[in-house]
């Protein structure tokens, strides 16, 4: 009797190789699967060529980051306490937003990122939100044409936080707010007044925008009770349009600093320059002379560090010895205080004792009562 075709055993389905190789006979779980996968894998694509440094941005493979720029990760009791307080009150700091390399040292009170220090802690609070209306090519702060409106509770929350820290010196800074009629000057001034009301003896430094050159806005802030008016020219004249947003400018910044100086007797003014962007020594000297010509008292100089490849290319890592040269040169042309070093930033240890004494001694003396 012929066997019915229905009774015949069905053919086995083909084994699907676990490795994906159609000629592989290894079953799932076989020890040879991994080897087979490696053998059958298509060749890895050639690595993409490094993007060549553009005229302004990108990484320059010829410029290597030196050892003197290495920093320990921030830690320490004071650092942890400040970070917690800032988070609870929903405050912004330029230390975090701008990826400052000195956050551990400053928040711990100078001396080191690990918590050892001299007790002079400096935290730079960023008011008017964390979103800037400008797009400077060196800056890591996020940007938008329409940032959220300022928090009306921010001046009070900032004052409460700073008063609870027990510090004697605080730096307030802000993003640029070209969307506001006065550039945020009145909000800035409210914060200063709230601080002075809660802690009358505190010294307040304000690192400001240029308020689009609005000198009335400069006056409103300069007369709010602050002790140091700081505004950065950022770089030498020839690099302004490359480094800064087109709405900023060298002469506009000088005008802001000059006007702030004239607003109040005893006003201390301050500015900062980044190095490593391709400036020449003669250009740096001229920038210092220009600042001294309008009476700027304090100058900081630091190394520009590129946040991402989309930001300006580092053209040079300036040596600590050259920074020492600039410190001595700055003092020789008349600055009352110069902080100069690879990791120095605008607010670097702003409240150290020398600066505190400079500010206090520069205040106009009240006439003696008869």
Curated annotation (Swiss-Prot):
Binding site for [4Fe-4S] cluster 2: 132, 136, 139
SMART domains: Elp3 (SM00729)
CDD domains for this protein: Radical_SAM
Coiled coil: none
One Gene Ontology molecular-function label: lipoate synthase activity
UniProtKB keywords: 4Fe-4S, Chloroplast, Iron, Iron-sulfur, Metal-binding, Plastid, S-adenosyl-L-methionine, Transferase, Transit peptide
Binding sites annotated in the UniProt record for [4Fe-4S] cluster 1: 95, 100, 106, 347
Residue ranges annotated for the Radical SAM core domain, each copy included: 115-336
Protein name, entry field: Lipoyl synthase 1, chloroplastic
Species assigned in the record: Oryza sativa subsp. japonica (Rice)
Lineage: Eukaryota, Viridiplantae, Streptophyta, Embryophyta, Tracheophyta
The encoding gene: LIP1P-1
